[in-house]
Amino acid sequence: MRRKITFLLTFLVAVLSIALVGGKVYADTGYEVEDYANQDFCYVNQDTGYEAVIVDDAFLLSVSEKSMLLEKMKLITTYGNVMFNSISYNSTSTESYIKSLYREKYGSESGTIFVIDMDNRNIWIHSNGAINRTINKAYAETITDNVYTYASDADYYICAMKVYEQEYTLLQGRKIAQPMKYISNALLAVVIAV
């Protein structure tokens, strides 16, 4: 009888310890679950009606990182809607997912979405409307080429922040670095010269 009581008490203490002390860690960031808010961050520009939205379904960003990122994203709402979305599961390609998400959320309105797809290990930018005249597919690919190393290093906040900084730079009519374009042009020139 004493063994049964000892076993039950040990079992109860073990279960309570796991329940009280245990906490899941997501995306190898070192943040505990409590550091994340299961809420979306959203801002609506009162002058334009465009919104900035963060939906972090893959739990890649801490609450403070979401707040700082939203501040960067607010600048883009002068030109159109802007969204950050991270996903941990995707049954389609990243391109199909982001296009479907855009149509569902914004229809044909001006805007841009940046997705970090943890299932397909991919980052993607999709723009539409007036913003697409500036941040077209070529510039979207250039931007993702410029920031993919941050995502590879699991520095998701810096990755997203750099995306929105470069998008804002382009929307202001300024230039961004395009090292892959220059390298491929140089190689093409060498091949043609030979």
Go through each PLM region and give its residues.
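A structural boundary signal for the start of the first folded domain, especially the loop/turn
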Residues: 2-194
